[in-house]
């Protein structure tokens, strides 16, 4: 479900004073000043990883499953410079990777007695890379879906959701039913859980006697931010944690509400023993209290899992 890496491109475009408002949209009266610049360069810096110690049984299980893990595991993800990928992942001014996803994977590596060889790709290449063996593990806010579970295995570690963000002067304040979006133009990521949900519910507006919503799908978020600024897009449908972060750091936008939630997990090759080992590692971190420290650091306490599961039943 990740649309995180593409948000980086939006900042470069949107931060140079986005287009003046020119919309007759019924929900937007003046969206001129939306600017995807961070209002603060601060981020949490406490160390939540060094206290994690290697677990001998998990280390042995890892080497039995993959002897090459003694020299490290390859992890496929997307490049996230700056702070705009937070709370999941980003980079500080020193080029150090930061974020909840980063802390969690580093804690897991310590627990397993291994290291990560992080390789960056694009969101749509990570799962194929896991399938063909390029990556041992993929991590990029992948939501569990039935389609994905057919080709990779999941070890869950977080719950994220599908939420809505709009210009601050939008007449929308909370969306409890998708039919409230009827007649509006929605921006969303192509090939994501957001597209799945919008397509699945597309007929509901007509059934309610309302004008259907229009969706514009993009491979990165720069056009969505531009659309919000010039009134061509009424709402942005994206991941909950990212949009909540954006609402706190982007001028003149507001978080509306969450429509649904989805477990998020590491992905491994179908049938790989690594999924079970990763789930056991997450569960060990939960039992030891280390997992809670990571969530608290990034203020996402309410989005954790009570236990990591391999291939839970998908709702999408």
Annotate each PLM feature.
Residues 17-21:
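C-terminal motif of bacterial Sec signal peptides marking the signal peptidase cleavage site
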Residues 22-32:
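Bacterial lipoprotein signal-peptidase II cleavage site
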Residues 30-139:
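Extracytoplasmic small-molecule ligand-binding "clamshell" domains
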Residues 34-56, 102-111, 170, 179, ...:
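Extended ligand-binding regions for polar small-molecule ligands
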Residues 81, 94-110, 142, 160-220, ...:
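Bilobed "Venus flytrap"/periplasmic-binding protein-like clamshell domains
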Residues 115-179:
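Acidic, polar ligand-binding/catalytic clefts
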Residues 125, 141-149, 199-200, 227-260:
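A ligand-binding cleft/hinge motif common to bilobed small-molecule-binding domains
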Residues 159-166, 244-283, 301-316:
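Periplasmic-binding protein-like
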